[in-house]
């Protein structure tokens, strides 16, 4: 029976490249000259530091542009609250990997509502979709691409 997996993953190598590019842009921008502002990556968390909250918001725009240029969807980021003190402001940005149970149920419900001849089952942080024909799977992919979910979806592990 043909099948494929629906996942939501971020390429960590591209994420590192995007953060490096954003740091290089910070070093060359005139409005950040002489300012201790930087991005740091720690696993699936990006920490950004700047002297003021306003500069953090400017850094968010820089990061979004660099991520988009590297092919990383900004929907996979979860921006935390801005913490400020006298010396600096900082913000944690969490990179979401995998599909949460709640969203996986929404995706499965969307496939059922489309009345396609496919079955879906939740396997941890991914969703397996099976159908009798490859055409049914292609229709399922079209339905999922048209749907609005809170995170970017990728389709992999195609089996015939």
From Swiss-Prot:
InterPro entries: DUF520 (IPR007551), UPF0234-like_C (IPR035571), UPF0234_N (IPR035570), YajQ-like_sf (IPR036183). Disruption phenotype: Disruption of the gene leads to reduced adhesion to monolayers of human bronchial epithelial cells compared to the wild-type. Mutant has reduced persistence in C57BL/6 mice compared to the wild-type strain. One of its GO terms (molecular function) is nucleotide binding. Keywords: Nucleotide-binding, Virulence. PANTHER family: UPF0234 PROTEIN YAJQ. 3',3'-c-di-GMP 1 binds at residue 33. Transmembrane segments: none annotated. Pfam families: DUF520. GO terms for cellular component: cytosol. The keyword Nucleus does not apply. 3',3'-c-di-GMP 2 binds at residues 132, 134-135, 160. Belongs to the YajQ family. This is Cyclic di-GMP-binding protein Smlt4090. HAMAP family: YajQ. Gene3D superfamilies: 3.30.70.860, YajQ-like, domain 2. Cyclic di-GMP effector that significantly contributes to virulence. Binds bis-(3',5')-cyclic diguanylate (cyclic di-GMP or c-di-GMP), an important bacterial second messenger that controls a wide range of cellular processes.
């Amino acid at each position: 029976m043909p099948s494929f997996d629906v996942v939501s993953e971020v390429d960590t190598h591209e994420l590192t490249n995007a953060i490096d590019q954003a740091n290089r842009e910070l070093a060359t921008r005139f409005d950040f000259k002489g300012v201790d502002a930087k991005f740091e990556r720690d696993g699936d968390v990006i920490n950004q530091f700047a002297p003021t909250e306003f500069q953090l918001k400017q850094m968010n725009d820089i990061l979004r542009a660099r991520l988009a240029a590297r092919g990383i969807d900004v929907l996979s980021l979860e921006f935390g609250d801005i913490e400020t003190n006298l010396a600096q402001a900082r913000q944690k940005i969490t990179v979401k990997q995998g599909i949460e149970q709640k969203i996986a149920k929404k995706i499965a419900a969307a496939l059922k509502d489309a009345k396609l001849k496919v079955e879906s089952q939740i396997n941890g942080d991914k969703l397996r979709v099976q159908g009798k024909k490859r055409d049914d799977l292609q229709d399922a992919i079209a339905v999922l691409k048209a749907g609005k979910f809170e995170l970017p979806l990728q389709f992999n592990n195609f089996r015939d």
